[in-house]
Regions:
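Short, Lys/Arg-enriched N-terminal segments with co-localized hydrophobic residues
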Residues: 1-16
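Soluble "head" domains of membrane/secretory-pathway proteins
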Residues: 12-24, 39, 43-49, 56-201
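Generic secretory/membrane-interface signal
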Residues: 2-4, 35, 124
């Protein structure tokens, strides 16, 4: 009878060990997935829901989009330490995600209109760069802006950005600084995945 009890105990112990091994295997899988998702979200992608109409008709209120963090290089806050490596700079007409200059806890999404060192003028609903008589071609805007702005010279390390919905956008025309610095740019808007898939440009 002693050997029977001992045998039962061994079987029970093996069973418990097997169950714990399976639980640990699942736990490891979950940990790995969480780490990968966290790394992708913090290093590669920006996952955002659009809260306002400022980029209509290109991006609508409620759209869910991915931004690509590595489009211009690496700009990462790693446990309070900033890691930054620039590969390329934003170009005119790029739609960028950035820290709002007047409150860096907020992130904004707008279109790059003027580049570092350029002078921008918004007059009679059109945008002019560096005193050109020819206005920018902007087929993406919802409607022409009612108010004039400028001329304004963008600082050396800055970008002048506006929303596509020109009359309903809190953008560089309204801000205290009137520009986004290169270091505040987090990434480039990539594609919308909800309510339908669309490449953003």
């Amino acid at each position: 009878s002693f050997s029977v009890k001992s045998s039962k105990r061994k079987i029970l112990r093996r069973l418990i060990m097997r169950i714990w091994k399976e639980i640990w295997d699942y736990a490891k899988m979950i940990i790995i997935v969480v780490v990968i998702v966290t790394l992708v979200n913090s290093v590669v992608l920006i996952n955002a829901k659009i809260p306002s109409e400022s980029m209509e008709k290109t991006i609508m209120t409620g759209d869910r989009i991915f931004g690509f963090r590595l489009a211009y290089g690496l700009n990462l806050d790693f446990f309070g330490h900033e890691i930054s490596k620039k590969i390329k700079d934003p170009e005119r007409f790029d739609i960028v995600i950035f820290k709002y200059p007047d409150d860096e806890t907020e992130w904004f999404i707008k279109r790059v209109i003027a580049l570092p060192g350029e002078t921008v003028l918004v007059k009679d609903g059109k945008v002019y760069i560096n005193g050109s008589k020819k206005a920018l071609s902007e087929p993406y805007i919802k409607e022409e802006p009612v108010e004039d702005f400028g001329p304004y010279k963008v600082p050396k390390n800055g970008y002048f950005v506006m929303g596509d919905n020109r009359n309903n956008s809190n953008d560089a025309r309204e801000w205290e600084t009137h520009y986004v610095s290169r270091d505040e740019v987090l990434g480039k808007a990539w594609f919308r995945y909800y309510p339908s898939i669309k490449v953003i440009k």
